[in-house]
């Protein structure tokens, strides 16, 4: 990514010099397994890999209007699921059809963190991750497994 992140993109707290997700966030998101907050893909607005994402979206059935993709943690990297593979996370990139769309991932993440941290509402572990061009995306651990 080129830029170190010292605020955890999941729990929104300083990481104590570490870059990426804090140990507490990793425990919640992936049972303590180390995962990178950088996706191994370029943002697909430039049509690079669009078929890969389109094929992946056919394998996930989550209601709602925003496009969603299925991810697994593979050797520390969040990647799209392959056919027949059970996803661990749901990825929601920036939508193309909304005003102020660049704020959608942060808005959804902040809303979930306020629910969990301020009001004590049980919420699925979530965070921000980033495409290789630093475009943010929202992801959440699946709770229906």
Question: What is the predicted role of each segment?
Answer:
Residues 47-145:
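Conserved ATP-binding subdomain of kinase catalytic cores across diverse folds
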